[in-house]
Amino acid sequence: MTEDGGASVHASAVRIGNRAVLIRGPSGSGKSHLAFDLLLSGRSGQIAPAILVGDDRVHLDTDAGQLRVRPAAELAGLIEIRGLGIRRCAFAGEAIVGLVVDLAADDSERLPAPEALTTRILGILIPRIPVGVGYSPLPLVVAALTTTESSSSGNHSADCLKGIGNHISPTIATE
């Protein structure tokens, strides 16, 4: 626990649009790499604008029934970029978590069970992507942020309202 009562966790977080992606996983699993990839994707327009919240260690607490993430004070504005070392970058002081990505997840499957696609943190249910060892998480995160689930109605054109490319409607993870 931190001084303000929030949980301190070994994770990274990036705010994309109005929501943060919380990236969890063991040491060396690629948390910082995915965080930086998301920052680059935001700059390129592939996803909504992205800003670092925290890398390596973040604080979690609840706010009005939502999960809030903040950077660890001593690491605020710092990100590890393999091959360059620790670098400074712009950061957000806090964000509401809209998506959790678990790297090196044991329950990663090609067609995951619905219960594998959510997680409960501090009593709050959050959408989740389990990513297995050896799989690239960036395409999965971009897909989660820019597509919707397939409907059983057969009206597949309504699933992606604006078609292809960068014009797909955002999902709850970024709203």
Whereabouts are the PLM-identified features?
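Conserved NTP phosphate-binding and transfer environment spanning the P-loop NTPase/kinase superfamily
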Residues: G93-E175
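Domain-scale detector for complete catalytic domains at protein termini or as standalone homologs
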Residues: E3, R24, A173-E175
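Glycine-rich phosphate-binding P-loop
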Residues: R19-S44
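Pre-Walker A (Motif I) flank of P-loop NTPase domains
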Residues: A11-S12, G17-A20
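N-terminal pre-Walker A segment at the start of P-loop NTPase domains
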Residues: M1-V9
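Conserved nucleotide-sensing/catalytic segment adjacent to the nucleotide-binding pocket
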Residues: G45-D102
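Short acidic/polar mixed-charge low-complexity motifs
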Residues: R19-V21, L75, I124
